[in-house]
Amino acid sequence: MPGYAGGQTKNPTYEDVSRGDSGHIEVIKIEYSPEQISYEDLLTVFFATHDPTTPDRQGADVGTQYRSAILYTIDEQKLAAEAFIKNLDESGPRVVTELKPLKTFYAAEEYHRNYYSRNASAPYCQIVISPKLEKLKTRFNELLKNSE
């Protein structure tokens, strides 16, 4: 579920978050079953499919709302993420991913939900999202529920 979290503005809109003064990050809320996929696997996919080393930027998208972050819900997630980040830091560029507790998640507006499937031919989807999805399918096919 796409949404916003990590900031101080209550019930933010996309416009609020885009201005950069809400403190929120554009996020995806992931609900998972540890029996089906491990938190370690989720961390592996997360760090492999975006740039965790550049502050306030993902590709051509620039702004505080694009910063890399893990908003954990239990201490075990925090500890696992800290260890994962430590290993990444020791083997490459410094990771700038924020790590903090999730306080409140605000669901994004309806037009952001299933955005890619509804707009797959749009230039942004073709240039930015499609290559990331192909990388995800190629590298992590065994973890994907519906890989076709």
Residue spans for each PLM region:
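Flexible coil/turn and secondary-structure edge motifs
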Residues: 1-148
